[in-house]
Regions:
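N-terminal beta1-alpha1 ligand-phosphate binding loop
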Residues: 1-27
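Loop/turn-to-beta-strand initiation segments
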Residues: 2, 107-112
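Short hydrophobic segments within beta-strands
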Residues: 6-8, 36-38, 112
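Short glycine-rich anion-binding loops that position phosphate/pyrophosphate groups of nucleotides
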Residues: 11, 85-88, 115-118
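Short, surface-exposed alpha-helical segments at coil->helix boundaries
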Residues: 17, 21, 67, 121-124
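Conserved beta-strand segments of alpha/beta enzyme cores
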Residues: 32-34, 129
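S-adenosyl-L-methionine/SAH cofactor-binding core of RNA-modifying enzymes
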Residues: 33, 39-107
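Structured adenosyl-cofactor binding patch, chiefly the S-adenosyl-L-methionine
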Residues: 117, 121-165
Length: 165
């Protein structure tokens, strides 16, 4: 499998970076896996009235600009999977089946994790598939670890290894 995990923001906590590096190291036996970060943008002015979407104009601008940075990393022929609360929830076995399809389609799979404000409408429109791990909201830093662990679990299922229970 050829995959890019594309994220907004840089991990600062060592326990998250250590976990991500461990799963990326484990995944190397199953293909090419890369973790790439784009900068998260700070909101200069937290004042402002939220619109119908619950976001202020400044927050919408941050989401738009982060989305542009993400889209610059995505190639035209990539298969894009956006992590989104309203995406499809899968079991580990079903994710394994999806990973097999993604591996067989011959395209690079790009798994996109948004920042604290989520993904822009433009990134969501570019997504070929929307994946959800829960209806709950997780910190985007933790979501990287969860995603990498689940992809690793999916790869072990495909390989018939004992990791998956």
């Amino acid at each position: 499998m050829n995959a890019l995990i594309l994220c907004v923001g840089q991990l600062k906590e060592r326990y998250f970076t250590d976990a991500c590096h461990e799963y990326l190291k484990r995944l190397t036996r199953y293909g090419s896996f890369e973790l790439r970060e784009v900068p998260d943008l700070k909101i200069a002015d937290r004042s402002g009235t939220p619109g119908e979407d619950g976001l202020t104009a400044q927050e919408r601008e941050v989401i738009r600009r982060e989305g542009e940075a993400l889209l610059k990393q995505i190639r035209k022929d990539d298969f894009v999977v956006a992590l989104a609360i309203d995406g499809k929830q899968l079991s580990s076995q079903e994710l394994s089946d999806m990973c097999l399809k993604w591996r067989m389609n011959g395209r690079r799979t790009v798994l996109v994790i948004g920042g604290s404000l989520g993904l822009s409408p433009q990134v969501m429109a570019r997504a070929d598939y929307k994946l959800s791990f829960s209806k709950m909201t997780f910190p985007h830093q933790l979501m990287r670890v969860i995603l990498l662990e689940q992809v690793y679990r999916a790869m072990t299922i495909l390989s018939g290894e004992k990791y998956h229970k």
